[in-house]
Amino acid sequence: MSRIGKKAVAVPSGVTVTIDGQTVTVKGPKGQLAWTVAEEIEVRQEGAEILLSKRDESTRAQAMWGLSRTLVNNMVVGVTQGYEQTLELVGVGYRAAMKGQALSMQLGFSHDVDVAPPAGITFATPKQTEIKISGIDKQLVGETAARIRRLRPPEPYKGKGVRYAGENVRRKEGKKK
């Protein structure tokens, strides 16, 4: 069983953490994030560390302990460094371009696909076949990347589609004559 909950979350200088009941608010140079911790978990701040402990020994408390610690750590990292996800477009004529704040993609459909960024997310297209998604909320960055990938997932025969940078797409052999 994982014991990640025992590890304290280090709070770097320039980051302020406010604990109000079960709500943890983290403010940093890149922005502010808030999250409500489960009732089974107790949160306290000692100096430059955030400590989480279980209120009881239930199975749910054990599960929420490690999860809560990781989510609070993700918040601290998000407001200091931020998160970034890179997508690649593979295929003839597949390209992306910025249209104001929104992302406009040609993915082999009869029309362009436009995606507006959710609050707190920014898009960038360093190359026509590359999309960078960045923000302070790790979960929202990953969800936005998955939503864009879902528009045209990589297919197994030619490998065309939208894929994560470094993703290994399993290829299949075509029909034999």
Curated annotation (Swiss-Prot):
Domain of life: Bacteria
GO biological process: cytoplasmic translation
Keywords: Ribonucleoprotein, Ribosomal protein, RNA-binding, rRNA-binding
Region feature (Disordered): 151-177
GO MF annotations in UniProt: rRNA binding; structural constituent of ribosome
Pfam family, one: Ribosomal_L6
Any Gene Ontology CC annotation: cytosolic large ribosomal subunit
Entries under InterPro entries matching the protein: Ribosomal_uL6-like (IPR000702), Ribosomal_uL6-like_a/b-dom_sf (IPR036789), Ribosomal_uL6_a/b-dom (IPR020040), Ribosomal_uL6_bac-type (IPR019906), Ribosomal_uL6_CS (IPR002358)
PANTHER family: 60S/50S RIBOSOMAL PROTEIN L6/L9 (PTHR11655), LARGE RIBOSOMAL SUBUNIT PROTEIN UL6M (PTHR11655:SF14)
Function noted in UniProt: This protein binds to the 23S rRNA, and is important in its secondary structure. It is located near the subunit interface in the base of the L7/L12 stalk, and near the tRNA binding site of the peptidyltransferase center.
Subunit structure: Part of the 50S ribosomal subunit.
Family per record: Belongs to the universal ribosomal protein uL6 family.
Protein name, entry field: Large ribosomal subunit protein uL6
Provenance organism: Phenylobacterium zucineum (strain HLK1)
Lineage start: Bacteria, Pseudomonadati, Pseudomonadota, Alphaproteobacteria, Caulobacterales
